UniProtKB/Swiss-Prot annotation:
Protein name: Glucagon-2
Keywords per UniProt: Hormone, Secreted
The organism's place on the tree of life at top rank: Eukaryota
Compartmental location: Secreted
Molecular-function annotations in GO: hormone activity
Function in brief: Glucagon plays a key role in glucose metabolism and homeostasis. Regulates blood glucose by increasing gluconeogenesis and decreasing glycolysis.
Homology family: Belongs to the glucagon family.
Pfam families in the record: Hormone_2
A GO cellular-component term linked to this record: extracellular region
Primary location: secreted
Induction: Produced in the A cells of the islets of Langerhans in response to a drop in blood sugar concentration.
Amino acid sequence: HSQDTFTNEYNKYLEAKHAQEFVQWLIKSKRRGGLT
């Protein structure tokens, strides 16, 4: 099932991308002093 493998890899990629964006957002929030 090559389709399953592709979906799996794609999901992993999306998760990594989402995690990266979340980290970036956290850093921005901390810089603004929104997180105390």
